Design a protein with these regions (language model features):
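Domain-level marker for long, solvent-exposed, non-transmembrane regions
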Residues: 1, 20-137
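Bacterial N-terminal signal peptides
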Residues: 7-16, 20
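Positively charged n-region of N-terminal signal peptides that target proteins for export
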Residues: 1-7
Length: 137
């Protein structure tokens, strides 16, 4: 009976751990929504947290990729953003909270969103692969 209990316990534990591992959503890229902001698209855009720390920019993307494709794509609405091949599948959508930098060319996101992106980036390659789209006004 102990052996049966141990096997059942082990099986339940494995299923539980597998379930938690698969419950983390896998994102295929990032969409930053700047539709309501006075944002100026730029080839050298930076995404910053509320403390001014860079979350994404040219330093995160290989020079070869950036030269061929740019570090972001710009679109006019969420439907275009989600359909963009750069992030297609299951992109994470983040709302930009303000603009900053010369000519309003950089976006600021909440510290919570920045933390989430940094956490995801530890396990996914969407930042260094330039899988980023920005929705512009």
């Amino acid at each position: 009976m102990n052996k049966a209990f141990s096997v059942l316990f082990l099986f339940t534990l494995i299923l539980s751990l597998a379930g938690s591992a698969f419950s983390q959503t896998v994102y295929t890229g990032l969409i930053f929504d700047a539709q309501t902001l006075t944002f100026t698209p730029s080839a050298s855009v930076k995404i910053l947290d509320e403390d001014g720390r860079e979350v994404y920019g040219s330093a995160y993307v290989s020079k070869d990729w950036a030269d061929k494709h740019g570090i972001v794509s710009y679109v006019k609405d969420l439907a275009q953003a989600k359909a963009n091949q750069r992030v297609a599948g299951n992109p994470l959508v983040i709302k930009a909270i303000k603009v900053t930098g010369p000519n309003n060319k950089d976006l600021v996101i909440s510290n919570d969103d920045a933390h989430r992106i940094r956490d995801l980036a530890k396990h996914l390659n969407f930042l260094d692969a330039g899988k980023v789209v920005i929705i512009v006004p």
